[in-house]
């Protein structure tokens, strides 16, 4: 079948058609068979009345099931629609196929949306985002650049229908900002903003230089997910082994020789707490459980700290050689050094038009896009 050369949409759909058998065999980038298996497992859990004894666990299971159901249903519907369109195209003469362009464009749009969902399939992607901006090398120019980035991300959030809450803001000594932290609220806010973390470089004739000379300045952006503040520790009876034994200690009239000492073992972690402080077995048990909860709390807190450290990624100095993206205003371009993507409309980028840069960054993070981190001298 000859493709209509004027319709890039047909190329996209036929690319899908040529590879769909491989997708069915392996699950492809969409991993639909795996998602369907996981969805069935979650639906079985939701039917278990005991799950609802823990409202927070039930909420998380419900949310995951809803996301998976949305992806699976969209894929199956799209698969059916595309199959029908492709069969119809096979039957039509070449000159009549262009009439299907609106339907093909809609199918291609849905295909893109589904593909983008696969790029947001990582921990905490669905959560709100905490975004922090700090100026680096460049003095007043860098402080102004940090404020420009703050506006850029605020405009991006507005374009996506997200809410922005200023958490902390410190003005610069002369202009701009010395520090800013905002909370971006919306579905997938963290997922979308996560590839923006890193050092951003600005090159322009400086408005703070009376001679109008070209200046280079830097600002660092950190993006982390908003997570639950409280570390909740739930002691499940089936995860505990409680032993009662005779208290031990130095001899004497006041020695506790009753079977009041209590040892509590937390089976999943192996943490053991023994308490023989009082002659009351009940009080010793209560104290042992309190100590166990405290130790589990600390264990979970450290785990979250390590997870947050991993999410922050490598901390690079906010200076030359560390940048992920350059905004060169006098030469009218923005270049992402990880993905190689270049834009020639920096005014739109700085007004929050970031989606192509973000999708490219997510592809790069997922290992689906090759770029270069080489930075040319300006």
Swiss-Prot record:
For molecular function, the Gene Ontology terms on record are: rRNA binding; translation release factor activity, codon specific; tRNA binding
Where does this polypeptide localize? Answer: Cytoplasm
Where does this protein chiefly localize? cytoplasm
Give a single Pfam family match. RF-1
The N5-methylglutamine modification is found at 253
For this UniProt record, the keywords arranged alphabetically read as follows: Cytoplasm, Methylation, Protein biosynthesis, RNA-binding, rRNA-binding, tRNA-binding
Per the record, the domain of life is: Bacteria
**InterPro entries in UniProt:** PCRF, Pep_chain_release_fac_I, Pep_chain_release_fac_I_sf, PrfB
What's a single GO CC term here? cytoplasm
The job of this chain, per UniProt, is described as: Peptide chain release factor 2 directs the termination of translation in response to the peptide chain termination codons UGA and UAA. In endogenous ribosomes interacts with P-site tRNA and 23S rRNA. In the presence of truncated mRNA in the 70S ribosome, ArfA and RF2 interact such that the GGQ peptide hydrolysis motif of RF2 rises into the peptidyl-transferase center and releases the ribosome. Recruited to stalled E.coli 70S ribosomes by E.coli ArfA, but cannot be functionally accomodated in the peptidyl-transferase center. Note T.thermophilus probably does not encode arfA.
Q: How does it assemble?
A: Interacts with the ribosome. Interacts with ribosomal protein L11. Recruited to stalled E.coli ribosomes by E.coli ArfA.
Family statement: Belongs to the prokaryotic/mitochondrial release factor family.
Q: What is this protein called?
A: Peptide chain release factor RF2
Give the organism's phylogenetic lineage: Bacteria, Thermotogati, Deinococcota, Deinococci, Thermales
Name the encoding gene, please.
Answer: prfB
